[in-house]
């Protein structure tokens, strides 16, 4: 009897210890899911049944959380600032705008443009101007955005001659002049590459819409890519204009150091100023734009993303969507058409496996801004969708 009593007490002690351990695991939330799986319900799944749910076991009032199908998809907004102090701690527009973008759109990525300058399309000298933020200001802006849990994408833009001359028109007749330009461009860009690296930006474009220069000898581009890569540890991209989609892909775009290629997508869906029926926009967008981007991605053998897309608050939003001149400013406002254009783009992009992100032009930019408009609600709908 005494021996049996000892066994009973020993077994009781073991059971008590095991009970304490199991209780601790349950309270800590660290019980292996492989063991929990055998207790999962086999009830009818929630809508979007391809998505799993996770249980917050630390709280007794647990709420299923829907996992995003594409958690690395870049749900972006472009938020440009101009001036030497742009993006720094004194830039209140930057501070307020970051909060508004989060609340109104739920964007996870911020595209931060840096405006460089050259005097003409044949100048070999690239410089900063009084519209260019300092490297320190850019670093501060990156940290401010990241403190609000944004990912940051740094994009250099190039203004030519202080006018609306497009950077894609820059060209040279000799390789020597091209080399001079690339060296000067690197000297202007380098301090911002350093700032982006030190502040921890996640992604950086080596250039934007330099359409005619894209035909420069591949060694010049590969040298630029290597120079940036030696400093910046994050993802590298190049952003081309949509008109380049109709040309042969330059060999340097296959450089493995470029993780993806961005496209500025201002492709019109109509050839005359008219309001389009929102019901036809998703199919029209896929036919005229989606197929073109998919074909480019397949030929490139890399995923692509929309580094810039925008639609005016206008009844003619789908006609020459890049325009911002006096005629565009005189168009009748139509926030519903703008929102329908956003919706058509996102309906196609979010589910396209060839496309890994999208950035809209632009927060607080007149004509294009979605701030406090139906377009912002469309962004929020898609950026918080389980399909994103």
Label every PLM stretch briefly.
Residues 1-17:
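N-terminal Sec-pathway targeting helices
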Residues 19, 23-24, 28-36, 40, ...:
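Aromatic-rich peripheral "rim/lid" segments of glycoside hydrolase catalytic domains that contact
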Residues 30-109, 143-147, 151:
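N-terminal carbohydrate-binding accessory modules
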Residues 72-73, 105-125, 136-214, 314-319, ...:
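Substrate-binding cleft and catalytic face of glycoside hydrolase catalytic domains
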Residues 86-103, 181-195, 243-254, 339-348:
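Short, acidic/polar
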Residues 122-126, 172-177, 273-280, 317-339:
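A solvent-exposed, charged loop/short amphipathic helix patch at secondary-structure junctions
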Residues 133-141, 147-150, 155, 223, ...:
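Glycoside hydrolase catalytic-domain groove-lining segments
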Residues 216-239:
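Active-site neighborhood of glycoside hydrolase catalytic domains
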């Amino acid at each position: 009897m005494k021996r049996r009593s000892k066994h009973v007490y020993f077994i009781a002690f073991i059971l008590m210890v095991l009970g304490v351990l199991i209780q601790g695991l349950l309270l800590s939330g660290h019980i292996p899911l492989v063991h929990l799986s055998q207790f999962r319900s086999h009830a009818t799944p929630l809508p979007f049944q391809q998505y799993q749910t996770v249980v917050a076991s630390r709280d007794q009032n647990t709420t299923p959380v829907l996992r995003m199908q594409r958690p690395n998809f870049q749900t972006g907004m472009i938020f440009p600032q101009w001036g030497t102090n742009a993006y720094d701690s004194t830039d209140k527009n930057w501070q307020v705008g970051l909060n508004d973008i989060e609340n109104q759109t739920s964007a996870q990525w911020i595209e931060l443009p840096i405006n460089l300058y050259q005097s003409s399309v044949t100048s070999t000298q690239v410089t900063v101007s009084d519209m260019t933020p300092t490297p320190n200001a850019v670093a501060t802006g990156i940290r401010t955005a990241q403190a609000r849990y944004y990912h940051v994408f740094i994009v250099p833009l190039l203004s030519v001659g202080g006018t609306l001359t497009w950077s894609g028109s820059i060209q040279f007749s000799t390789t020597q002049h091209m080399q001079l330009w690339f060296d000067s461009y690197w000297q202007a860009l380098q301090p911002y590459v350093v700032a982006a690296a030190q502040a921890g930006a996640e992604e950086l474009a080596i250039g934007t819409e330099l359409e005619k220069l894209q035909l420069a000898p591949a060694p010049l581009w590969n040298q630029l890519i290597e120079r940036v890569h030696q400093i910046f540890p994050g993802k590298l991209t190049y952003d081309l204009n949509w008109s380049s989609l109709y040309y042969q892909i330059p060999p340097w775009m296959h450089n493995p150091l470029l993780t993806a290629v961005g496209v500025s997508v201002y492709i019109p869906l109509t050839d005359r100023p008219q309001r389009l029926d929102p019901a036809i926009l998703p199919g029209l967008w896929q036919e005229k734009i989606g197929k073109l981007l998919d074909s480019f991605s397949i030929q490139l053998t890399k995923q692509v993303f929309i580094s810039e897309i925008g639609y005016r608050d206008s009844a003619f939003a789908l006609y020459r969507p890049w325009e911002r001149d006096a005629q565009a400013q005189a168009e009748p406002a139509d926030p519903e058409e703008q929102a329908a254009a956003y919706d058509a783009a996102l309906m196609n992009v979010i589910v396209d496996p060839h496309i890994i992100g999208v950035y809209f032009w632009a927060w607080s930019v007149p004509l294009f801004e979605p701030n406090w408009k139906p377009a912002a609600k469309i962004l929020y709908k898609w950026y918080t969708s389980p399909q994103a």
